[in-house]
């Protein structure tokens, strides 16, 4: 069973997107869940845009559609996540829209490095949060 964890920056970014007026990004949690639901860890590790790879993990940028606004994968969201090579674990690092009031065109190398350092720090301090991909990305009890 694949475990889905997140760092605090991801959770803050997701919460900020959900607060944007008129519910512009209201479908973001659903799109994330749909992308991973019923996928094996092998499927999650492959067929994506790899950003960074080392001996222990792969960082991937996944293109997600925004079906609520009728945007294709190229105009929807970018989900940046890390997949561990030694365990069935996915760590959600960042999410950003390509369109709309909170749009971001890409993730810079220094931003990515900061997210990875945050993961290492939160892993050590046990601040990572586990999510239920079958239950709208809610925190697992």
Spans of model-derived segments:
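Enriched for short, Lys/Arg-rich terminal
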Residues: 70-141
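A short, surface-exposed loop/turn module that caps and links secondary-structure elements
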Residues: 40-70
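Arg/Lys-rich, positively charged N-terminal/basic patches that mediate binding to nucleic acids
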Residues: 1-36, 117-141
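A broad, low-specificity signal marking well-ordered, structured residues that form hydrophobic/aromatic
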Residues: 4, 59-60, 90
